[in-house]
Amino acid sequence: MTVSYGAPGRVNLIGEHTDYNLGFALPIALPRRTVVTFTPEHTGAITARSDRADGSARIPLDTTPGQVTGWAAYAAGAIWALRGAGHPVPGGAMSITSDVEIGSGLSSSAALIGAVLGAVGAATGTRIDRLERARLAQRAENDYVGAPTGLLDHLAALFGAPKTALLIDFRDITVRPVAFDPDACDVVLLLMDSRARHCHAGGEYALRRASCERAAADLGVSSLRAVQDRGLAALGAIADPIDARRARHVLTENQRVLDFAAALADSDFTAAGQLLTASHESMREDFAITTERIDLIAESAVRAGALGARMTGGGFGGAVIALVPADRARDVADTVRRAAVTAGYDEPAVSRTYAAPGAAECR
């Protein structure tokens, strides 16, 4: 039986590098999706093809980390995680199509892993709840691919819903829906892809995580979330000033997530926009994960009339989001494109986006 299963990319509205620190984040699922079509066969491997790559990749069912590389490593990681958890995985043919841009900060990797997990589960009739699937996906990305990411991307892809943001508490692993419908207030969410690609399997992401872990160790706690209620004064016990700056971002970002959710409850997109900009400034000054190109896009959007703008995703490239009054959206988009080209960068791809459904079988 052939099955098709789709999983979305995501935009993290606010709450960057907070997930592995057991803090808060507020993502939405995107209308852009990765779809995996899987036909089980009596073979000892899965042959995978992607519309993003030439040729095919052979994934042995007994694959181990490091055996499959490149784009296919994410699919192989999903297979490895499923089998490691005792779930059945048959051989077969797998076809992958996607309109989630790779390296744009929209979590193309989580969309691919989630779609593979869903397709194999649907083909075998295996019922796996969403939280377990998120943990399997994280294990695939952490331990097979080698990207030290948290649960954010996978929870967003699995729990996403139309006109809904997800307030995630990573200490308790709870997901609370928060109404997110800016169009109802004549505000649009602009997604501005810088076309500067990034990769979480690279070293900078891991360095930020290690810095946060050192800061927590200096404070005598297992995660920075444990000192959230103590305020910034607690950071004086952190030995390394760079580690202290990283921790300051995490604590202030957690509060911004909660304040952003409160602003949404009041339909106060002016306040929400200001929090986006404050988040970007914190990522630039304290966490040092933005780039000159990304900063230019965010700052140009605000100067042109956006209520606020910030980089979304793990950093070092990718995309910027902005909340913009609907009647200013075209001017903001034109200004951002012009500013980037004038500075010698590729023209950003600017589009309106919205909160969309999460992962599901394609019927």
Swiss-Prot record:
Keyword ATP-binding among record annotations: yes
What Pfam families does the record point to?
A: GalKase_gal_bdg (PF10509), GHMP_kinases_C (PF08544), GHMP_kinases_N (PF00288)
Residues bound to ATP are 50, 103-109
Q: Give Gene Ontology CC terms.
A: cytosol
Which keywords fit this entry according to its UniProt record?
A: ATP-binding, Carbohydrate metabolism, Cytoplasm, Galactose metabolism, Kinase, Magnesium, Metal-binding, Nucleotide-binding, Transferase
User: What additional remark is attached to this entry?
Assistant: Was identified as a high-confidence drug target.
What protein am I looking at? Galactokinase
